[in-house]
Regions:
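Membrane-proximal basic amphipathic "stem/tether" segments
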Residues: 2-3, 319-327
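A conserved beta-strand-loop-helix scaffold within acyl/acetyltransferase catalytic domains
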Residues: 4-54, 61-69, 117-143, 147-253
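Short alpha-helical functional segments enriched in proximate histidine and acidic residues
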Residues: 20, 102-105, 270
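Short, high-confidence coil segments that cap the C-terminus of an alpha-helix
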Residues: 43-45, 105-108, 218, 273-276
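Short, flexible, mixed-charge acidic loops at enzyme active sites
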Residues: 69-74, 295
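Short, solvent-exposed loop/turn segments at the edges of secondary structure
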Residues: 74-78, 141, 307
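A gly/proline- and charged-residue-enriched helix-loop-helix capping module
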Residues: 76-122
């Protein structure tokens, strides 16, 4: 008989779920149900909760289903198995086996995981990387993230310094704002439409709603020249990591005004100088198989260096491979 029990998440579990997220060793506010459910109409939620023999919640899996595949999570930047800091490797192996057996009974064929990058963890949390190896999981994608260690910075390049000085010479001013309207409507939406014929993942209504739920985790910084908005960035703040979620500016912002260099330097050197990591994000295309070289170099010229985020495809039936691991 298993020492763990798996059950589907239900709306009545929200407080229990959110309390667990707040104390887990590898979670951020993106796993809070107030964040996950802003777009619940787009996904068929199939999140899981795992309890031990004492009926204590020890792990959760933010997830949704598409046919016979369970994803964790296509609607989030990252996903994977979220763990209590008290669980140890042997328990995580048994928890994973229990999850896969549960999914097999529910006639799932695959579990796809989008692992949370290590910098977001509060404690070492590579259990699932090891377990994916044990399960002979397919590494379906690997992205390269450019990350700056704010506490131990590699010197910024001379090119970036020139951009920063250009921003100062052009009289640029950065202000934190609570209203996203001007940035969204005047810059972000038009630019995404013109360049990529797409829209922001979050609508103005959605980002405003999320800001109301997470006022300390979602921040907006606009850049002004002569009181006119010329650029801006929407930042997601987690315990260890500062991550620009959206960045946009007018046609003069990047080159003529030095706005992008000026804005990022301001955030790193002033607003978030006491934080741990600044995650510039990925520069990948084609499911991680190609890198936008100039974009990644721009991030590296701030002193950022590369870590990876792994995506795994697990065959549910392979749970038997975990039977003989513990000796």
């Amino acid at each position: 008989m298993s020492n763990f029990r798996v059950q589907r998440y239900h709306s009545s579990d929200s407080n229990h779920w959110n309390t667990f997220v707040a104390n887990a060793k590898n979670a951020t506010f993106l796993f809070h149900k107030d964040f996950m459910e802003y777009h619940k109409d787009r996904f068929d939620d199939y999140s899981l909760m795992i309890f031990n023999v004492n009926n204590k919640l020890v792990a959760i899996l933010p997830a949704h289903k598409v046919d016979s595949v369970l994803y964790s999570h296509q609607g989030l930047t990252y996903g994977g198995l979220v763990l209590s800091s008290k669980v140890i490797l042997s328990e995580v192996i048994l928890i994973t086996k229990c999850i896969l057996e549960f999914l097999e009974k529910k006639e799932f064929s695959k579990l796809n995981l989008k692992i949370i990058p290590s910098i977001y963890n509060c404690f070492p949390s590579d259990e699932m990387e090891y377990i994916c190896f044990l399960l002979e999981a397919k590494l379906s994608r690997r992205d390269a993230l450019a990350v700056l260690d704010i506490t131990n910075q590699i010197p910024i390049s001379r090119v970036r310094k020139r951009g920063i000085e250009k921003g100062k010479a052009n009289g640029l001013v950065v202000k934190e704002e609570n209203d996203f309207t001007s940035f969204w409507n005047e810059l972000l939406i038009p630019n995404l439409k013109e360049r990529y014929n797409t829209k922001p993942v979050h609508s103005l209504f959605e980002i405003t709603y999320l800001k109301s739920k997470f006022p300390n985790q979602i921040k907006q910084y606009n850049v002004y020249q002569d009181d006119k908005i010329v650029g801006g960035v929407t930042v997601f703040v987690t315990d260890n990591v500062i991550h620009p979620q959206y960045i946009s500016g007018n046609k003069a912002f990047n080159n003529e005004l030095g706005g992008l260099d000026f804005l990022y330097h301001y955030l790193i050197s002033n607003v978030y100088k006491n934080e741990k990591y600044f995650d510039f994000g990925i520069s990948n295309e084609n499911q991680g198989k190609q890198v936008n070289e100039s974009l990644h170099y721009w991030k590296e010229s701030f002193g950022a260096r590369t870590i990876v985020q792994n995506f795994y495809e697990i065959e549910v039936k392979n749970h038997s491979l975990l039977d003989t691991v513990l000796i």
